[in-house]
Amino acid sequence: MLINFLLVGFGASLGAMLRYGISIFVKSKWKTDFPYATFFINITGSFLLGFLVSTALGPMWQLFLGTGFMGGYTTFSTFKVESMELKWKANFQVLFSYVGLTYLCGLIAAFIGIMLGV
């Protein structure tokens, strides 16, 4: 049982570090109201998680990669906070684009990941 917690924790720490690195890199390249870093992270995360859940990985790999790594990598809470910040700035065009594209592209990416993993 302890090994399961360690697998999830180690995977999450690696995923969070990758998310942080990507976020820093993207924000240094693109200065815009659209939150490209979080968008990229969540779309690639949707694809990767879709792929992982459709493969024949063992339960320990699912814990490490699916629950841990992908849980640390993707960020639903940042998506919501950035959405609220856009609302508070009354930047509705970017807000609706961000929310709509995140949900639409996330579903498509997860579907493609699942299809490729089967």
From Swiss-Prot:
The keyword Disulfide bond does not apply. InterPro entries: FluC. Na(+) binds at residues 71, 74. The chain crosses the membrane at residues 5-25, 39-59, 61-81, 98-118. It is a multi-pass membrane protein. GO terms for biological process: cellular detoxification of fluoride. Na(+) is not transported, but it plays an essential structural role and its presence is essential for fluoride channel function. GO terms for cellular component: plasma membrane. The keyword Metal-binding applies. Keywords: Cell membrane, Ion channel, Ion transport, Membrane, Metal-binding, Sodium, Transmembrane, Transmembrane helix, Transport. Pfam families: CRCB. One of its GO terms (molecular function) is metal ion binding. It comes from the Bacteria. Fluoride-specific ion channel. Important for reducing fluoride concentration in the cell, thus reducing its toxicity. Belongs to the fluoride channel Fluc/FEX (TC 1.A.43) family. PANTHER family: FLUORIDE EXPORT PROTEIN 1-RELATED, FLUORIDE-SPECIFIC ION CHANNEL FLUC 2. This is Fluoride-specific ion channel FluC 1. The gene is fluC1.
